[in-house]
Amino acid sequence: MINLMKQGLGHRTPQQEAVPWGRKFSRMDNFWPRDGSCPLRFSERIERAKMIQKHELPILEYDSNSEEVIRPNHGAEQLKLPEKCVYAFLGEAVDDYAFEAEATVAETFETITRNYPVYIVKQDGMEFCLCAAPLGAPAAAQLMDFLISCGCKKIISTGSCGVLTDLAENEFLIPVKALRDEGTSYHYLPASRYIELNKNIRDAIEHTLLVQNIPFQECVTWTTDGFFRETQDMVRYRGAEGCTTVEMECAALAACARKRGASFGQILYTADSLANIDAHDERDWGKGSLRKALELCIAVLQTI
């Protein structure tokens, strides 16, 4: 079980208490490496501090130093997951499929909200990881970062999106780039307005949909943290900029994957409509696409 709530991250080891140089260990003074070596000396700390790109707005500040205090695989250093992964915003449909496929549970990622089983599926000569994704960029990126750190390097995600134009429900879309209107991606990559998704994975998704004779469109998606702050003027503005869909994770997941050296792509299916800003249409939230979207992700993995 991976439980970040129970790891005792605030306690120092006896080795840290006995710091050389004749003084107490301090979080503000030194970082004690995991290999037991000496803390960073003052000159080294100064050099690392230079890696922080500072800005008046905190969201635009970025630390290019990849040595995090808490590594993504914290507590599961020995876990080795398959290279291929389906990471799906499909709720119980993921667990249902895992049960039908007689999947095994390699690990359980625990959070205060719910636990996420990490399934291993063996199907048609392929072994892949299957995991349900939590709603929202911070939670989704945290779990995907964990999966990558444990071995997943080719990740196909799927989930619903709202539409800003006149698109029918349950249509499939392939995001080419995502507008970074969330906060999480800025912790993985320096600031930019958009992030492009991996072309090789996009091509594999397009090939799979073409082979199965499934209509699709490419799209520019608007990734936002503010579900209830999709204002009328902002919807118009994003639409004028070229965004045709809105969701809450794509930009963050693409940034996380790029930072960690993984390949990531996503299949979106249309749910509610914001095309008429005076009358939001929930429709059926794209529920008719859940199973097909999951099957398409698995089919894409067969080609990469």
Residue ranges, per PLM feature:
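Non-catalytic positions within long, well-ordered alpha-helices that form the structural scaffold/packing
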Residues: 148-149, 239, 258
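Metabolite-binding pocket within alpha/beta catalytic cores that recognizes anionic/polar moieties
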Residues: 48-195, 199-203
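His/Asp/Glu-rich mid-to-C-terminal helical/loop segments that flank catalytic regions of hydrolases
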Residues: 274-304
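Zn-dependent metallopeptidase/amidohydrolase metal-coordination segment
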Residues: 251-285
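Active-site rim beta-loop-alpha module in soluble metabolic enzymes
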Residues: 195-240
